[in-house]
Structure formats: C-alpha cells, structure tokens
Amino acid sequence: MEWDERPGSNDVPTPVMVDVGDHALCAQVRGKGPTVVLDCGGSGQGIGGWGEDLERTLAERATVLTYDRAGVGRSGGSQARTVAEMADDLHRLLHALHLELPAVFVGWSYGGLVTQLYATRHPSDVAGLIFVDPTASGTPPGSALVRDLSFLLAPRLLRLRAIFGGTNAQPLRELAVTLTGMQNAMREVAQARQESGLPPVPIRVITAGRRPRMPKTHLEHLNADHHALADQSPHGQMMVAERASHQIPFEQPEIISQAVDEVLSLPPNSQEDLNR
C-alpha cells in the first residue's frame, strides 16, 4: 500500500479501509520513521480521537497509526467480545499495512487494556509500551452487587442518551457495548499479565494529576495498578501529568510526546536485546 508523500498531503491524511480477514478496519497513517501505534480509549474510535496537535507532533519523527476498532466508527465487522480479539485484529492490521516492527504502542484508557493484551500475545512486535492513564485491570474494590449494578445501568443510560444524541448517537451506542463487557475485559487482562507478563521493553505509565472525587479505595486500586504496570519491566517508569485530568492527550499532550521520544531515543540494539 502506498501513501501520498507530496508536500502538505500528510497534514490531513485520508483514512483507508484495510482487509484483516472477515472484515475491514478503517486506518490512518501519517509521518515517516519508526512505527508508533495509538490505541484510543472509549468505544475505540481512534481516528481523530487523539487530537490534531499530538498526532502532528508525533508524525514529525515517526510513522503514526490510528484506527477504529472492529464495529466502531467506519470499521466493519462487529465489536469484539474479548480484548484478545481486539489485539489480534490490530496485529493483522499492522502486518497488512507492512508497517515497520517492532513498534511503540501507546494505549489511552481502555486502549491500555488492548495494548497490554497485544504485548502478551505478540511480544516480538513490541519495542516499547506507553500507557496514558490506563484503565485498571483486575477486579475493582467494593461491593460486587454495587459494581454489577453500575455496569448494568451505565450502558442502558448511554443507549437512552443515544436516542437523543444526534451526531453523537453512534459513539454512545458503541461505548455502551464497551462498558457492557468492561468487567470481563479487566479480568481478562489481569489474567494475561499474571500468566505471561509484559515483555521487558521500556514502559512509561502516564497517570493523571487531576482526578475527580472518588472513593479512597478506588483511587488506591487505580494507583496500585499503574505502579504495577511500570514495575512489569526493569525499564519501566511512572510519569505524572500534573496539569491534566483523564483527557491527557488534549490537556497535556507534550508529556505523551516526551514519553515517545524517550522510548524512540533508545539505540535499536538495546530494544532488540530487551525483546529477547
């Protein structure tokens, strides 16, 4: 597949549909250099979901891939039932596009779960991992009954909002599907980390410095998981986006650029050694 490299053509690249088997994924590639994969949070509408400033900055030094997950945005198929299916979809997409591997994977929020599963299933594809305020894996603290009711009611409220959502109707319905399977996704990733662990590549975990009010036990659970992610590698580090809430790509995008630069600056032979 060829990309238009004429001056100015890479400013707003045209998304393409890429066959990954029984469906096609909508993907956007911009820039030149080593591959950086941005895996978005929410329902998984990744094209345009990271903010133009961040994508443009990263594309000055890397080949940047964004994409919509199956059944989301402009991608075909149905929304995946498991995180492993999402990770394998991304694996097929990267190889279909013939992008340079190993790549640096950047997962924001729910995308952090996808990139973790990707790393456990396809470690040779991974040169580095950057988690942007990732969703915590495992089982959150508190009452199981309250937790189950919350994950039951939230998708229903989103679907109700979608009835009057106008242009936001589709993303709201897609997010409802994601939340319906959220508890299973968090358990799935926790189990994969326990069984396989992440590859010993450089890891940066960027945590939000401005959090909404939440129970102390939930905050402790979130912080503990972020530190545990960084500790998965001898080359892991925590970073705090002091000025940002969960919306780090929009409120403090420079800290993501810094993390990518740190990982990309490692000599190629060091990354190869880490992947062995």
Predicted segment positions?
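Conserved hydrolase catalytic core segment
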Residues: L101-P140
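Active-site loop/oxyanion-hole signature of alpha/beta-hydrolase fold enzymes
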Residues: T66-V106
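Conserved HGGG/HGGXW glycine-rich cap/lid loop of the alpha/beta-hydrolase fold
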Residues: V18-G76, V260
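Flexible "cap/lid" loop of the alpha/beta hydrolase fold
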Residues: L129-A162
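Conserved serine/cysteine hydrolase catalytic core
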Residues: G165-A244
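N-terminal cap/lid segment of alpha/beta-hydrolase-fold proteins
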Residues: D4-A24
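Catalytic active-site module of serine/aspartate enzymes centered on a nucleophile-bearing elbow/loop
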Residues: P234-R276
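Active-site loop/turn elements of alpha/beta-hydrolase fold enzymes
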Residues: R69-V72, G77, P134, A208-R210, ...
